[in-house]
Swiss-Prot record:
Residues 1-24 form a transit peptide. This is MICOS complex subunit MIC27. It is a multi-pass membrane protein. Component of the mitochondrial contact site and cristae organizing system (MICOS) complex (also known as MINOS or MitOS complex). The gene is APOOL. It comes from Gallus gallus. InterPro entries: MIC26/MIC27 (IPR019166), MIC26/MIC27_animal (IPR033182).
Length: 272
């Protein structure tokens, strides 16, 4: 019985030591964890580079199909709108012509008759001539008949066509003139460049000749005259007998007379 009590007392007394050792082991194990192992504190790579995602084969095929089909779809849209507008305009023109012909003015039929007769006359006149005359005679006579039947409209159309022809001729003239002036300017520039190069060569030759002549003249002058003779002739030394000493005389205006005046020199002493 006593042995059991002793064992229990020993076990109870050893419990704090066991807990302390277990806690120390846990602390030591927790300290061994590195920051890189934690998911929150992962360090970014030192050298980072942005790499664009390259498209795959399927994406490339879809993009090529889209580009090719887009061009054809655009052309089809343009053709569809052009045909649609033409059909709408032709339908509207037919409606207007039907309304106009349903109730025509009294002078319409005679005018149409004159125009048709003039066109047929042109065809008859040019039936045995060349192809150009077969086309020109009917067109000319029909335009003449239209201008006779509708003079006001003919004048307006003639003015508009004349302005267009004048503008076109002016543009062609300016284009030809610009080309001609460009050629002339190029030839002038070539001639000027040639003349400038020739003048530069002449100036260089003249300057070289002058420089050589100047060097020769300087060398000849140095050999002819010595420095001692030139110094003796230009700057002669004064002789000892002719030297004279002059006394210093101060200016009375610059002297300090104090409270006296220059007239009372005999009465007051002056400071120089």
């Amino acid at each position: 019985m006593a042995a059991k009590v002793a064992r229990l007392a020993a076990a109870a007394s050893s419990l704090p030591f066991v807990c302390a050792v277990y806690a120390e082991e846990k602390e030591s194990k927790s300290q061994l964890v590195k920051p890189k192992q934690l998911p929150i504190y992962c360090l970014p790579p030192l050298k980072s580079k942005y790499i664009e995602e390259q498209p795959g084969r399927l994406q490339k095929q879809f993009s090529s199909i889209r580009q090719t089909t887009g061009r054809y779809i655009g052309w089809c849209k343009d053709a569809f709108f052009f045909a649609k507008n033409g059909i709408v305009d032709s339908i509207q023109f037919g409606k207007d012509a039907y309304v106009y012909l349903k109730n025509p003015p009294p002078d319409f039929l005679p005018r149409v008759g004159i125009i048709t007769i003039s066109g047929l006359a042109g065809v008859v006149l040019a039936r045995k001539d060349s192809r150009f005359k077969k086309i020109a005679y009917p067109l000319g006579l029909t335009t003449l008949g239209i201008s006779v039947c509708y003079p006001a409209q003919a004048v307006v159309i003639a003015k508009i066509t004349g302005k267009k022809v004048i503008s076109a001729s002016h543009q062609t003239y300016e284009a030809v003139r610009s080309l001609w002036t460009k050629k002339e300017d190029a030839s002038k520039l070539q001639q000027e460049s040639k003349s400038v190069t020739q003048e530069n060569k002449k100036n260089r030759e003249i300057s070289n000749v002058q420089f050589e002549s100047a060097i020769e003249s300087r060398s000849s002058n140095r050999t002819e005259s010595s420095p001692i003779e030139s110094w003796s002739t230009k700057d002669p030394l004064p002789s000892s007998g002719t030297v004279k000493t002059t006394k210093f005389k101060p200016d009375p205006k610059l002297m300090d007379h104090g409270q006296s005046s220059p007239e009372d020199v005999d009465m007051y002493s002056t400071r120089s």
